[in-house]
């Protein structure tokens, strides 16, 4: 447990007296209340999370998480098992204990992923229709240069040969499976690479709660901001620009929340975020292309080539805002 103000370790958050009266503990280092959110309603806590209050994040990620995880036994070491029966029992115990321990977090991830899948599906469909109908002579389209290379000039026919075009020829259930795979892979890579860079490269760790659990919970809380674009489906706008702006705001939430929890410099957090984003961009779709092409090398090569050409064309033009 820590003080949410100075992040120093403390022995307790509050003291319970005989009449069930609770007195919050004062931090011996900064003299502030160790964790005022112990007595604050969950609605107010949620509002403070949206406002990126440092204390709200630290309360949930450090103190609340530690109290929750301490209720469950530690995992059994599989290396200590002497026979197959002991190994199987220990493995089953660890699996059951993991599902019980992280049940609430897993349900939150499932909820967020459900929204993310739907938003990704809607966004990709809107982009596909937009780019398919895009015309190089459209007055809204401004070329960055009048003498762009031929490969940079927009050709809407390219969209008909991409993986997105192939996906939208499938039935809705198969489309949903594709976008579910896309989102799960994207979130998994973001989660894995972020943990790797913070824990392994920057050697950040927390003394009491598992550092992996801390980073994982922080990502979960900040990832909730990525469902904000659902509002764009309730109050639709004419272009995709507003949705893109909201998505970038969600990215800022992730950066700020990681800064609050890890106390690393903004420069380190931004470097990690950019690196992870680039890795996701160049890994998620190629991996899915391999499966969509059914490991056919010529089809894989063609789809990746079309995606690369599409990327060049998008980089060669931009919308007049």
From Swiss-Prot:
UniProt topology in membrane: Multi-pass membrane protein
InterPro entries in alphabetical order: Arv1 (IPR007290)
Cell compartment(s), UniProt: Endoplasmic reticulum membrane; Golgi apparatus membrane
A Pfam family per the record: Arv1
GO biological process: endocytosis; ER to Golgi ceramide transport; GPI anchor biosynthetic process; intracellular sterol transport; regulation of plasma membrane sterol distribution; sphingolipid biosynthetic process; sphingolipid metabolic process; sterol import
Residues that span the membrane, as ranges: 179-199, 214-234, 248-270, 272-292
GO CC field: cortical endoplasmic reticulum; endoplasmic reticulum; endoplasmic reticulum membrane; Golgi apparatus; Golgi membrane
Alphabetized UniProt keyword annotations: Endoplasmic reticulum, Glycoprotein, Golgi apparatus, Lipid metabolism, Lipid transport, Membrane, Sphingolipid metabolism, Transmembrane, Transmembrane helix, Transport
Presence of the UniProt keyword Membrane in the record: yes
Entry keyword annotation includes Membrane: yes
Glycosylated residues in this chain: 296
Protein family according to the UniProt entry: Belongs to the ARV1 family.
Record function comment: Mediator of sterol homeostasis involved in sterol uptake, trafficking and distribution into membranes. Also regulates the sphingolipid metabolism. Required for growth during anaerobiosis and sterol uptake.
Protein's recorded name: Protein ARV1
Species in which this protein is naturally found: Saccharomyces cerevisiae (strain ATCC 204508 / S288c) (Baker's yeast)
């Amino acid at each position: 447990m820590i003080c949410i103000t100075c992040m120093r370790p403390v022995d307790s958050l509050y003291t319970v007296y005989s009449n069930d009266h609770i007195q919050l503990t004062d931090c011996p280092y900064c003299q502030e209340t160790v964790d005022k959110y112990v007595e604050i309603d969950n609605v107010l806590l949620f509002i403070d999370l949206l406002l990126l209050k440092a204390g709200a994040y630290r309360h949930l990620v450090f103190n609340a998480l530690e109290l929750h995880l301490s209720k469950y036994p530690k995992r059994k070491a599989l290396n200590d098992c002497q026979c197959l029966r002991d190994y199987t029992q220990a493995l089953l115990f660890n699996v059951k204990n993991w599902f019980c321990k992280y049940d609430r977090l897993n349900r939150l991830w499932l909820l967020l992923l459900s929204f993310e899948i739907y938003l990704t599906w809607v966004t990709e469909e809107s982009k596909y229709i937009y780019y398919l109908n895009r015309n190089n002579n459209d007055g809204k389209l401004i070329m960055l240069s009048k003498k762009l290379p031929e490969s940079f000039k927009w050709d809407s026919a390219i969209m008909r040969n991409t993986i997105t075009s192939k996906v939208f020829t499938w039935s809705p259930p198969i489309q949903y499976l594709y976008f579910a795979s896309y989102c799960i892979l994207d979130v998994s890579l973001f989660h894995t690479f972020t943990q790797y860079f913070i824990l392994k490269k920057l050697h950040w760790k927390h003394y009491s709660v598992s550092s992996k659990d801390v980073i994982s919970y922080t990502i979960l809380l900040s990832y909730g901001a990525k469902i904000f674009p659902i509002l764009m489906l309730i109050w639709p706008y004419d272009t995709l620009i507003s949705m893109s702006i909201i998505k970038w705001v969600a990215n800022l939430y992730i950066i700020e929340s990681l800064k609050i929890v890890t106390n690393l410099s903004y420069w380190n957090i931004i470097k990690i975020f950019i690196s992870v984003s680039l890795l996701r961009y160049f890994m998620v779709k190629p991996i899915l292309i391999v499966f969509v092409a059914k490991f056919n090398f010529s089809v894989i090569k063609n789809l990746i080539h079309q995606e690369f050409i599409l990327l060049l064309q998008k980089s060669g033009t931009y919308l007049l805002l």
